[in-house]
């Protein structure tokens, strides 16, 4: 495989450690563990990471890490040599480790299976059957489990019906020409053969993973009742032989399937420090390369202040001693997310992040990384006016968002599973997470603009308490309970489904009106008990952010007509009456968690939605009897 260019932002989301990437030539490889990032071509770790560090103390405090680091960019050393051959640039020739996976491949001519090492960089191998070198094709299947493990499909064990087989015969992957797994079979030179029927099936007998027995686990061992368990492989650690104990039942999936890798990320909007002087000092420190790792070298706050004054003497001489001290403490300790016993829960800490953002977004602010202009506050008395359903509109002309990769899931995006993976995410991302030098997580920062608005809270509470709304919504709660689905109880509320659906239809309308592709517009929901806000924004990796088209739509003369059009458009789906009727009766979408919502009316691209296109229902918006906007 040739060197594969990836964007830095992709390494924090879609293509993080443990993910499979496909090259333009069709070869697949796995991103290596974080232990091997920031190593040069000689496999040596670089000495300083200061230039990659992102200052977001709130997230560092929440995630209990010392550093948030941007993935390294590639700088070829030959471009930075002077006339005498000396390298004039630091941190050159940094690669992200790639490991060939799956390691099994077959000859396109004779279909014979061959296995190569994960370090192999070529698809050209000597075919024992054809007696010449052939460009091999990697097999389409891998084996995964919901605990994050991934392995080569057990071809030899499957064809012999025995996980302890000793046969080392030559195998072939043959097709009889059909379009189902039954038409694919594996054949061994010992005359054993078997179709692949059932390898991707799973029978669910309980909401507990240990009882979700896959057909692969039940059928692999033909002659005994032994259930096949996941071997616990973590090939992204760099070794084909690394295994750990696992009680899960694996399942075969296509290697390019979306459920092979679901990244778990957490993000935060950068908020200004309450003291504007401290905020300015933090930016001065960042500009001069004064980071957390740098401050930790110096002992004592007084010594740190002395050294900082020497490095930034001309820029900070007018600032108070106390402000300089606070700026240093902010970087070191992450002031802003207090650590207390009652806030040790990750869920509570995430809520605290959103609460502080909400409290900031309702204000008028003008700082370097966050600029908010108050546009409109509800003063209208006319109940027939659409504006009476809203209480506030603010135009966010500039924002900075930091996105951190905390772990990943395979097979499921279940809320409880995602929460558990976040708690143990470092053990998936790092081979040795407890080493002092591994106390960091990969992060990426983006700049953008957006519209922040809140719903009339009193009107929302009154609507939510109506018996017909409660009766209708209880159907969704019953469906989740019957299926044993784990979703945060604070999320399953009529108001939250309403806000989420409203966000989607407004994003769709904004994409049509202001020319943005809907994939580039995102939502950020504020759903805590006393909040009912939505931030619709767009962002990019460029520090200049975007061009103001979305912010312009936040002006009241543009925003309310957009809302009216969005609601009118939501009244009819091209899949109606099916969409509406199924939504009212049995629900639809993954685990039937949606009401009247489908790809034709309410779904957004995955990059835009915070909740995976779940918990959507147009009925709560526009139904003549119980719709919020008809109340």
Model-identified regions with their sequence ranges:
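A Rossmann-like FAD-binding core segment of flavoenzymes
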Residues: 206-210
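C-terminal interaction appendages of subunits in large macromolecular complexes
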Residues: 186-190
